[in-house]
Amino acid sequence: MECLDFSKLWFSTAAGLQQRCYYDCVAWECLGDDDLQIFISGLNRLIESVAVSCTGDEDLDFVVDSCNEFVTGRDLKSFFAADLPVREVSSVGCISHFIPGSVSGLNVSDLLDNQLYGCSVFSSDFESKLRDIRDAALSDAASGVSQLVSCHFEKDVRHLLAENANSVKIPVPQKLSDDDMRILRDHFPRYELKFTQNVDGPHNMAAAHRLLETHDLLSNFPADAPILDIGGNWFSHFRYGRSNVHSCCPMLDLRDNERHTHRLTMTESLMSSLRHRYAGTIDLDPDAHLSRKVSDSMKEFYKRWAVHPKDLIRLYAGIRDGNSSLYCHHKFGVSWNDVLWESERNNCLTVPEPECPFKAKYAIMVHSGYDLPLKELIGGMVQHGVVELHGTMIADPAMLVATSGYIPALRCNWEKSKGQIWFSFRDDSTMGYRHDWEVYSKYLTSTVVSCGKHFYVMERDKYRHGVLFYSIIKCSGSLRKGDHTFFHNAWFHEMYDKYIMKVPLVKVKDLTGDEGSVECSWREVVMSRKLVDRVIEVCLRGVKPINFGNCDDAVHMDNLRIIQNHLLSHSQTLVLNGSTIIREEAIPFKDFSPVSVTIYFEILLTRYKESLSLAWFHAGLGPDFKLGSWVSSLKRVFYRILGFPANLLKYVLNALFRCRDKVSDMEFVKPAVEKLTVLENTYIGKSLMGDCPTLKEYDDSAFFNILENVGNELFNNSSTDSGKPETPEVTMTGNPNAVIAEAISYCRAEVDRIGKKCERILHAYQATGNCGGYLNDTDNVGVFDKMTSWVQKPKEFDHEFGWDGSSFIKLSWFGKIPDFVGRYLVVTDGTRVTTNLKFSRQYATIPATVTPTIKLVDGVTGCGKTTEIVRRYRPGILILSVCKANVDEIRRKLAAVDSKFIRTVDSYLLSPSVTGSCDELFIDEYGLSHPGILLLAIHISGIRKVTLFGDSEQIPFCNRLADFPLKYNSVEDVGLNFDREIRSTTYRCPQDITLSLQKMYKTKPIKTVSTVESSITIKPIKSEFEIPLPNAFDGPVLYICMTKHDESLLKLRWAKENISSEVRTVHAAQGLSYKNVVYFRLTRTDNDLYTKRKLPYHLVAISRHTDKIVYCTTKPEDSSDFSLSALKNTIKTSRDLTQEASGSESSYAVVFESNSEVTATKPEVCENVRKAAEMNFPVSSDALYQKEVPIYGAIPDPKGKASYNPGSVIRAIEELTPGNTSIDTDALDELVEVGPMSLQVGSIRWDVSKISPRLFTNNKFAVPHLPTGALLRRNTSSRQVGLAIEKRNANVMNSQKYFDLENLANKAVERFFDFFIDMEKFSKLPTGVLGSSAEQIQTYQNKTGNKVTDPVCVALSPIQKYKHMIKRDVKFNLTDGAQSEYTKAATITYHQPEITQVATAIFGQFKTRLLACRNKFLNIPLEHDNDLSGYLTKYHLGSENNTFTEIDFSKFDKSQGEIHQLIQDLILIKFGCDPEFVALWSTAHRSSSIFDQNVGIGFKTDFQRRTGDAFTFLGNSLVTAAMLAFVISDPDREKIRYMLVGGDDSLICSYGPIQVPLEPLGDIFNMSCKLVQPACPYFASRYLIRRGDEILCVPDPYKLLVKLGRKDVPDNQASLCEIRTGLADSAKYIFDDIVKQKLAILVQVRYNKAAPSLYDALCTVHWALSSNTNFSKFYTVTNTSNEVRRNRRGVKIT
């Protein structure tokens, strides 16, 4: 046999590959020619397989990498014939090595299948290394290392050396420090780095890292595949001979041109070096034959620099000739605007061809995407066919939350400023970098990016010392439709064990000690958490107690010295026995003293908290806990523990360290932020391009308002046949037909109401060019005009239908753009899921029906209805449910059953795919649906045996149409014969809940078999962040609430904290059962859902749990919260009213200031006023209508006794509202100005040039002697204005249903005239049009003092623009609500005087006509009629013994909408107001722009009542009267004796009890209100008191008591006299002893509390108001203020 040269054979079959020992496993020299050819064939297959595949054994992934340095015996058998001879094998553990040149006598078949073959680890180098390690370990007998030297140790060492021998060697030329080299080795462990240290340039570490990043990114793709390097350094690829990599290097600025020139220079330098080394060879053909010497030299160059010179020669030829494939200068990427829409090509998107012709499936970006927008990058990837991209960038997680930072590993400083992010490198004087932050940040936050139908997902793979590795990968295959939610966390590793401490910062300007010589503020420092914890723990036990009543600076200094000693002992470096011990971390000298002071503050605060805990233990904490009363009742405990009152804590801290920045945040030591969660939501829907993803910007309303649309998912999966379903051929007549007819009519009516609203919205846009009147509509209005795109965007872009101006049309969406025929489109929440629209079209004709056999299972909550459905299921049964959550639960329990047999009722009616295939029907939660819908589903199914499951006393069907009364609300109303089965045993509810449910169930008893006795916990909270987390419970938790608003807030928190837990509304939770339930209320706004009137909702809410329910409420004091009352199960105790009047000490006669009466004569009219009257709606040809209003008999001046007992005032206030006297909002006001704040004010415009801290803060006020709980005067600041806007204009609770707006408005006006207008007198009113008059305008100017020099034409003036301000004088609450909620300032929204004077004149004429023709049982306190005492005395003496009813409206002004405006307009027009003026005034209120010029805040609003225009009070009075007339029935109207209406206040006096339905007030008029049956007559903060033959309207004495301690009286005697005069004028009736005695009783009756000190307090008020001298004894006045409060008293408008 001829001997072959195997070395030639080897290089011919495995050219360029590194040899493994398993390539030489066969003893080939022993083979014949035939066997040798078989061996060569198998060897080639082995080499080819190793180059492209891996072992595939996951258990060996830690050993075997993609280079396949090991091969198993099983794999070798698959490549070589079994009878071929193999070489000898040397093994250690599972690793074996073929010994070259040996023959073992065994065959391939004898190789072990699971043995790993490869890696020459038995060389002499290995043995020498192993011997040295063993000798060193064994030489140290005390270390015990000798015990570790074993077979396993040797195996690990062999593996390590084997990996090093086969790792990729990369030279790193930059000059680096040892720490930098260590970091690079840690970052890139798969490479063997050769640090040559021969290049020193700018930011070497960043350059070296970028070099290795390039190698790492390229290793993710096949070796020879074409790869795009976007914006990359083409010289780097040339340097390493990567001919398959193409760099797109556009010339975007001068620096790009400079870089390209430098790269060409480096290329020439490299080739010059090669010419010097290889002489003329370098210019020869690279494929030409070279001498052996030159060839060997090139091999050495290849080993050292990982590139062959021949490859460089080939690439350089292209660069030299100007046609290199390594790079181009074309810009990469395509923007969305460059995408072409071609309607002629199947309505598709066309992406233009790129300027660069290079195509590749793979791409990399090495720090080159900073200025390339992500959307443009994706467009470029689509152009070039890229499916996967890997990239790197400089990043810091703190960029998402901070404005500046430092990356130590890269020595890189970064800073965000003016929309850009700036980079600079420490100790580097070269140019820095800056990039657009909006473009840059997308790479840190985006997860899903799309271009047309191409859908890419971005992953942030790893973050290493300032460098972020990311990948962008195209999604292949079909995309599931629906919502896809992604999130990722940015972790701040360096902050894990840190505290953020607030420390004092003192700047001493000079040593004089004068004002301004010392500047004090606060700053933040980062400290070790372990250090701070240790020092505080020790010092808590070591500081000396402090007597704050007599503070000694020496005590403070001693305590600080103790803290500083401990701080030093834990932070300084110690030397013990010659050894240096470093304790924690050193504290910089500038931080040492401030940190010790802050720790001192924290210790004081901790002691304070300890005292609170002890007081809490003694006093007990209940749901009615209030801070003010709690502190007031426990002062004695605080004195005993701390030695000073609790409300002096901040004063002490400020006195301890005097600075201008007062202590407003009591949290001195805070944990640092450890992570930030970034969320993104993607919706994939059907569009013209196919499955097109739509990205949604992350915000509360868009991402977390998850609607559980009944049937939406099922519709997409069901049949698309929209034809009429087949029905069984049966003839049916009877009552069910009427029920189904009502259901279909209801569906049509709802569609009609939605259509009319859409039509009104479209008309408003066509008339005004904007969506005036619907900007703040809670129905999420959207208007699209093809001429301008979206005029107003909706929150969601997934509506099924839209209104085109004439009808509803079905929509398809292209991203956020709808596809429809026509110009206009209107969408609302009502057009998103239009089930009723589909019903009304699909079932246009009502089929005749017969009644099947129906069994009704009416069971209490938790009786096992759903469990029985699951247990009884068999093939042939169809299961339907009204509730989508219930369907999901049944499907989970019956996972093997086809989903088409378990569906919602709505889904089944729209696509009845199983008609005729079932013989029995189960319908769960039947009570939630209209009975006609149930009967229709039964008829369509053709099933004669039906069982309905539900609870007749849980949440019933909700009628969403306010003006569509239903005859059939439940199946019980149908009149069919049901086989009813009552089930009264609950298996779910614990025993304590069952006791409460026994009182709620009216028709069924309830009992439980649960062994859980106690399950109720009530927890007062302040926000959603205090709601317990799911991990606090043992088992699954369900979170439920009443409103979608509360649901979205908690879902937002869960998403931010990466918490997965079920959150539902109570309505959506019906039918569910959980071990633990958290029932929460976040809104403090009164809502009808929380009252007893919504009993079914409360029944469902408290009965979802088996073990535990926690009720978290922000309003624990709300007595109208039925769930709270039921869970508390408190017993109301009655208190006897006591009357304890002390004798008068002296008698005083009331002394009033002289005030000459002004005769009511016609004012003298000036020329400007006459001109204004002629310009603005002058009166008609009829005479100006005036009517003299009768003046009722005067009330004789009362005389009485008075006494001076100031303590009785404080006692009376504490008896009525415990804790109010200790209210001090000074600290809260300061916290509002300097503390963190979150406002929900919607869209506002803020002029930043007007931002100012506080205005009008220099006024001085008189100091009251009595702590009555009066509130401080508010400062005008941006924060106070923001709070006021949030309370007065934002967050309107929408409770309206759908209704016919015009029809109901006309009915309300008709009822108003029928109730309150004497039509005979009305018919005698002048027929002329009301207008303005010069006398009326002049009277307005005389009264207000506003002199208008330049009159304007109102019709040509922008009356839709209002000015805004806040009322600095805060109206205090008559309850104890101020203790638990910060009182926000009221707002005033007003016109310019030139507009107000005209409007006032016109409305003044309307007022006189209204008063002239109203019925006597209506009284609106306007002008002369404000003397209610005379009115009631003349017409209704004796009515104090009748029945009184009071309607208490909440958020009255901002709850008004379009229907209220329409009612007002119709009444004005009927009374003869100029239609042009009415239309002008109405349009101005439809959409108004409001601007506060003090702080620069502006916003828009719609129909909300303006709080300061010319028609506010009268307009509110008309609306209130019209609403009450609409809801009160005619029989109850006959019982009414009189009705008082003033703004939103009302009082009805009737001869017997009447019913005032509250549902229409909420469903139609959007009013949140409650019905009050007062124990005594009370109207507009006045008590109605009978005194002899008179009825007196006496002001609420509680207000008078509080006003004796007013804190807003300017510090001068003149203001004090004015305030006293005004109080004495309004409180004149209290000076009568009989009135005082009756008033003391009535107040106790109204407050339901005993107040024995009240009579004494009223006598003290009498004494105080008797003279200025007496009143001044309650204040300290130093006359430091120039402001004078004036009580305006003048003529009244007639």
UniProtKB/Swiss-Prot annotation:
Belongs to the ssRNA positive-strand viruses RNA-directed RNA polymerase family. It catalyses: ATP + H2O = ADP + phosphate + H(+); RNA(n) + a ribonucleoside 5'-triphosphate = RNA(n+1) + diphosphate. Coiled coil: none annotated. SUPFAM superfamilies: DNA/RNA polymerases, P-loop containing nucleoside triphosphate hydrolases. GO terms for molecular function: ATP binding; ATP hydrolysis activity; mRNA methyltransferase activity; RNA binding; RNA helicase activity; RNA-directed RNA polymerase activity. RNA-dependent RNA polymerase replicates the viral genome. Keywords: ATP-binding, Hydrolase, Nucleotide-binding, Nucleotidyltransferase, RNA-directed RNA polymerase, Transferase, Viral RNA replication. The keyword NAD does not apply. Its EC number is 2.1.1.-, 2.7.7.48, 3.6.4.13. InterPro entries: (+)RNA_virus_helicase_core_dom, Alphavirus-like_MT_dom, DNA/RNA_pol_sf, P-loop_NTPase, RNA-dep_RNA_pol_alsuvir, RNA-dir_pol_PSvirus. Residues 984-1145 form the (+)RNA virus helicase C-terminal domain. Residues 829-983 form the (+)RNA virus helicase ATP-binding domain. The lineage of its organism: Viruses, Riboviria, Orthornavirae, Kitrinoviricota, Alsuviricetes. This is Methyltransferase/helicase/RNA-directed RNA polymerase. It comes from Raspberry bushy dwarf virus (isolate Malling Jewel raspberry/R15). It holds the Pfam family RdRP_2. Signal peptide: none annotated. Residues 1442-1558 form the RdRp catalytic domain. It comes from the Viruses. Residues 194-444 form the Alphavirus-like MT domain. GO terms for biological process: DNA-templated transcription; mRNA modification; RNA processing; viral RNA genome replication.
